[in-house]
Amino acid sequence: MAAAEPLTAFSRWYLYAIHGYFCEVMFTAAWEFVVNFNWKFPGVTSVWALFIYGTSILIVEKMYLYLKDKCHILVRCFIYTLWTYLWEFTTGLILRQFNACPWDYSQFDFDFMGLITLEYAIPWFCASFIMEQLVIRNTLRLRFDETAEPGAPTVPVALANGHVKTD
C-alpha cells in the first residue's frame, strides 16, 4: 500500500484561501455588530480576498517552516503581522490602480493611504497566532490517500514506538 501523500501546494493554497475568506466575512460581521449594533451580522468581502489570503498564508507557511526552530512564537507572529501589513498594502495599491480595492481605511485615525491601519495591529497579530497554530500546522499534517474509499474506515497505522494508532 502506498503511503499517503501530503497535500499539494495548490491544495493548501485552496484551503488557506477559503479560511481567509471565511474569517474576513466573520470579522466584518462582528465589526458591524460592535460598531453599529447590527443584529443582522452582515459580513462582506470581495472575491479578491481568495487570492489575497490564499497566497499570503501560503507564504506565511514557508516562513513558519523556516522560522519555527529559530525564534519564539511571539517573534514569528510579529514577523507575520509585518508581512500582513506589507501584503495588504501591496495588494491594495495594485487593486486601487484598477479601481478594484475592496477596503478603505481612510476613516481610521492611524491609516496609511487608506490601505492599511495600525488599529488592526492587535487583531492581525492574534490572527497570525491562530493561523500558525491551528491552520498551517494542521493543514501540513493533512494527507491525501488516493487508494482510500470514500467513507471507508481508516486503516490503523503502526507508530514508530510500536503502538498502533486507531481513531
Curated annotation (Swiss-Prot):
GO terms for cellular component: membrane. The chain crosses the membrane at residues 15-35, 41-61, 73-93, 110-130. Its main location: membrane. Pfam families: ABC_trans_CmpB (PF06541). Residues 36-40, 94-109 are extracellular. Residues 1-14, 62-72, 131-167 are cytoplasmic. InterPro entries: CmpB_TMEM229. It is found in: Membrane. Keywords: Membrane, Transmembrane, Transmembrane helix. It is a multi-pass membrane protein. The keyword Cell membrane does not apply. Belongs to the TMEM229 family. This is Transmembrane protein 229B. It comes from Gallus gallus. The gene is TMEM229B.
